[in-house]
UniProtKB/Swiss-Prot annotation:
Major localization class: cytoplasm
The family this protein is said to belong to: Belongs to the MraZ family.
Full protein name: Transcriptional regulator MraZ
One GO BP annotation of this record: negative regulation of DNA-templated transcription initiation
Subunit structure: Forms oligomers.
Subcellular location(s) of the protein: Cytoplasm, Nucleoid
GO cellular-component term (any): nucleoid
GO molecular function (one): DNA-binding transcription factor activity
Gene from which the chain derives: mraZ
This protein's record includes keyword Chaperone: no
Presence of the UniProt keyword Transcription in the record: yes
Length: 142
């Protein structure tokens, strides 16, 4: 399970170095083979390949009424492999689709990650706080 936030920088080629605390787990779980795809909330989803394959099968089975959503998730999916330096290449099309600049945030979300442009994540979190807690969290406490 992946958790935690990491502030990272993309290099000039659009590569992101995976933090060492996640790199070893990804090598064990999927030999560094991962899939990236676009999310409509303005981030990229980053899955270990076996996790993505399960989701891909579910998405492909959606009815024709969800065809536009299949295009978003499946049509933008990009299989990549971690290189020997622990980096993944984020395709220019994906970076552009979510407005990703050099400064990014990698968020562990359990079975997968989200990759956000750092500024967009801050804006998204501020908007969430401004909108208040959703009702589903009324009975939740730490």
């Amino acid at each position: 399970m992946f958790q935690g936030a990491s502030s990272l920088n993309l290099d000039a080629k659009g590569r992101m170095t995976i933090p060492s605390r996640h790199r070893d787990a990804l090598l064990l779980q999927c030999e560094g083979r991962v899939t990236l795809t676009k999310h409509p909330h303005g981030c990229l989803l980053f899955f270990p390949r076996p996790v993505w394959e399960s989701h891909r099968e579910q998405i492909a089975a959606w009815p024709m009424s969800a065809r536009a959503w299949q295009r978003i998730f499946l049509g933008n999916a990009s299989d990549v492999e971690m290189d020997g330096a622990g980096r993944i290449l984020i395709a220019p099309e994906l970076r552009s689709a979510v407005g990703m600049t050099r400064d990014v945030m990698l968020l562990g979300m359990g079975s997968h990650f989200e990759i956000w442009d750092a500024t967009k994540l801050a804006e998204s979190e501020a908007a969430a706080v401004a909108n208040g807690m959703p009702d589903v969290l009324n009975d939740f406490s730490f």
